[in-house]
Amino acid sequence: MYAYLKGKIMTILPTHLVIEVSGIGYECLTPNPYRFNHQLDQMITLHTQLVVREDAQLLYGFKDEEEKAMFNALNKVTGIGPKSALAILATSTPQEIIKAIESESESYLIKFPGIGKKTARQIILDLKGKLTITDESELFKEVNDTLLNEALLAFEALGYSKREITKIEKELKKKQFSTVDEYVKQGLQMFVS
């Protein structure tokens, strides 16, 4: 029904954010709403999906079309509902999920809340070969950039100044870690030295 909303983020809460569009506040459930902290009171475009249930109409918001497409694909898997799909997207990128599905990595999928071996197998069975992945080198760079950006936001939340963060950002870009935690640990060591 709604493809996207373009407006100002007014409120960020643990499960959702409120985006004001033409004087109306839309409550949008999003994966990890706190990643929008740096955009509070700023104009953004939020790609949306309306889910109508018997007892509620819920609006889900995503940073891009790729994330929205992954949400919709996961939501169609037997045993996965919108809540589980959001939980998966809150801690992983669509590219990482596709890579796990294509490599049949059940161990990667069962780390998400509410996903057991049976559901992980169902995700692989339903989605393998049906999702597209970008070029490997592009994928790796994109994943690294996402992880690094989340680490930089963590430094901001820890109270480091923009100037301090900019100093270590160039060095961190040279690293190729696979998790945000690794970037944060390395960055904290750089701040100390």
Curated annotation (Swiss-Prot):
Residues 1-63 are annotated as: Domain I. Residues 143-193 are annotated as: Domain III. GO terms for biological process: DNA recombination; DNA repair. Gene3D superfamilies: 5' to 3' exonuclease, C-terminal subdomain, Nucleic acid-binding proteins. Residues 141-142 are annotated as: Flexible linker. Homotetramer. Forms an RuvA(8)-RuvB(12)-Holliday junction (HJ) complex. HJ DNA is sandwiched between 2 RuvA tetramers; dsDNA enters through RuvA and exits via RuvB. An RuvB hexamer assembles on each DNA strand where it exits the tetramer. Each RuvB hexamer is contacted by two RuvA subunits (via domain III) on 2 adjacent RuvB subunits; this complex drives branch migration. In the full resolvosome a probable DNA-RuvA(4)-RuvB(12)-RuvC(2) complex forms which resolves the HJ. This is Holliday junction branch migration complex subunit RuvA. It comes from Macrococcus caseolyticus (strain JCSC5402) (Macrococcoides caseolyticum).
